[in-house]
């Protein structure tokens, strides 16, 4: 059974694009069914609500499901999907109906079968097929549902296999022609599903065609569990599906690039059934049948498709339109792809004949790393993860994980560590090699990895039967396999035996098991040389020759080995061991070795091994001399403490001999200021006038910089350094230019300003530098600039464009005000909008409609150049504005139809669903040191260990997590330079006292009263000194609470004596003066750098002070012992939310904090009219101690909460609307 269906389907797929049906849920919604409809007669007295259990309708409303199936077949569908998306026992448990899973699956398949047969009977030349649907369930096997325990799972691989097996049997029994595993958001779930399906096929003695369809969740191009499209494909390729595709989450416009990628890499047929666009404000889908068909037609004509249908929001009308659009279009031809081993973690790793040597990291192995073994034994898993992370950062493309140690529960340790690895993208991006001598440990590991990994290892030592059984399971789990050269006789130690065993194993795997040859990796045994035993002298050479033999005789098989074994005789002399590894790998790779288990951080380069030592090592490795071991031992001691030196680059200053124009270009590209004045003067002497130096070689050099930046070959910090060189050259030339009364031409004059009330300008400064690098003249008015000054200077300086920047949410209203004033005053200039709090939606809806001239949202520095060029070009401007208007019109239209992703609830309902904390059995901790604590001019050396460097790199548009970014393939070198410069500047600042950091905190008696928090003047708690006003989440939370910060303080009526903390810190005292001084010197790089490091110091101060409060001042976590990485990940008790941020988004509450602490008088920090903090590098907020306190986002609130908040604050409604605008619907 199934073979005929597959042949029939494949025949049709070669001739035309087949149609899958459309959305089932969408059609069910159109019936507007009520609770009683879902219950039917059978479930009238069921003990929980059943509305929404669409799959149950196959039992209670079968006629509706049949109508929907029939409508899709009438529209042209070839394949019906059964109504079983949520019919597994796991998903049905939500309705306590897990016992009905098999019945529902059977009934659903039977219904679809009946309808399909009816339509096939009408036209036997066009058979209709039933795809038994296996959905993703509501659990994830590779993601923890508990943010506090990334190693926890609420479902197991085995549990999923059991659930999917039950569903599969019923779907087959009901008459399914094929199995569709769809809407895969966690690949490990899908692997469990595929495992179940294959097991059931074997059990029933059948093999139906299998379709696989995954879900790319957003613009990141990844599944919910983090895999890229190709990594996802590699992980499930072993299923050998008839088709591989994508569905749901995205509309055709967004999904196109991923379907195109899949069409390039998939050896099987490609399917797609996208949504009808993205959901609007009402959760509905707006893409019409005609619009969707237009997209699909283009896909088909581009050769992406073999099967196509629709998902959420699609109807029979959509399918009919799509059927018409693809009719007669030639289906995608199956590509002829080269044979490769396709592995994956979160990202793909394809290994083929052209691939360079693959490094397998060896340090996550308890048998080979004393440090790793100690950490696992002590259950120091966070530090053990660091070992894995270091391996990847040092170049390991696969990590080998082994837990075989007598005192460990190897299976439990393997599962725990792999689950934790899955939560670390820097580690889980690479494939895993599950390494154990115990088969049960290997299986346990395979059940934890969502990518395609490698089993290390199986062999013939226990006979052919067990070898085959294990190989079949490896195949079913979807892994590649290492096969040891070991049979019933023993390990292969000669060239001949290595080939003999590998040949036998290869033919068993390929010919009898059906194992893909490209997924077979032989380990022909690397043994130690230079042992003093003559029989061992040929071990290395035999391995090298066996590599060549195996590659020649066994097509597509790969070769690996534990490289460190070869140097075992030289334990204790790491330098010589590294030299042996380098030489051995050099010859192995030449003969065809594909990968090796190595310490990725200690690989030496063959050519860097000193010649004398290299020759001695080669004598041993290649067994060229009978006295090779003795000679190597003699010279080994001389190298015991050495490390490979690197010769000085003698050509470092070779560029100084180049022509001056090339020297200037080199200096600009490399950011070298050392010779710039000297070279600029030389260029001036050669020019007829000084302006020619700017317009000639200097601008030529900056054009090269601009090109490299645009191509991604230079990064923002380098561009800023280039600008520094340019400014110094121009500053030198200015007196000569002025003396000649000459004027320079520019691409345009742009005024930039951070709006009134806002003090943040790092982003604006970077935009200014990038624009200057592209020959725009910049007038920077700085921060907190009132509207009147902006417009006055714009008129006086006759600027071409005005650019506004802001970070805090009140700045959005100020930008609207500036736009209105520009309209009122008759300006015609383009207006640019940028900054962290701005968005295209806000620009289109709130700003652009108040000003008739172009208003352009600029989301990053690199885009600014193109925008300004287009706006000031007579040729480009009309088309640019037309596209901009259309884009904004679409944005406004989408916004007008937008509703919250979750249904809003009343304030009364939200309060009724507050966080249910057990105050009766909880005693709030009393402070160890109550009162106010001031930290004036704290040593920067104290704060530097608390710095989180990741946001620092983001400031410079270098995306990646510290410290991994320092080794990033593309930006690593620049990140290292930037990191070095930042620390050098911090050293200077610390040494010379150029920046000061001050802060303060205090703890106050407090109690919650409804949504607000009363703060008392003393411990008698009789007098309310302050009230902290809070907002509550106001959308439906079926599985959680509607949080408000007051939930974390003991209610007044509880009688519990609780406390709240307040703090304010700054790392920026002196930062503005320093930045201005650097700017005056033409050094934009250090001007931006000082702002960036001041910001980091402020955040570090906040982290440091919170730790001090937890451990000493409040003292509720006196035993806490966390690393800086733990602090960054917030692995501590308590929270420190800041006014103006998601949990307490209303900025004016800072004024209360300032009063409580007397901040301005004590440490000099102040608030602007928009409640931005000055200095800008500052942090303030509240301290909560409750162990269940957590961060959350208030998000959108409703009118009833707006009125309540205004009333409690004593505000007019208009005032409340102004400060809460970001949390209100437009």
UniProtKB/Swiss-Prot annotation:
Additional comment: L-homocysteine is bound via the zinc atom.
Enzyme class: transferase
Cofactor: record remark: Binds 1 zinc ion per subunit.
GO CC annotations, alphabetized: cytosol
One annotated GO molecular function: methionine synthase activity
UniProt-listed GO biological process terms: homocysteine metabolic process; methionine biosynthetic process; methylation; tetrahydrofolate metabolic process
Residues annotated to bind methylcob(III)alamin: 695, 757-761, 805, 809, 861
Domain spans labelled AdoMet activation: 898-1226
B12-binding domain residues: 747-882
InterPro entries on file: Cbl-bd_cap, Cobalamin-bd, Cobalamin-bd_sf, Dihydropteroate_synth-like_sf, HCY_dom, HCY_dom_sf, Met_Synthase/Corrinoid, Met_synthase_B12-bd
Binding site for Zn(2+): 248, 311-312
Keyword Plastid: no
Protein name listed in UniProt: Methionine synthase
Pathway: Amino-acid biosynthesis; L-methionine biosynthesis via de novo pathway; L-methionine from L-homocysteine (MetH route): step 1/1
Cited NCBIfam families: metH, PRK09490.1
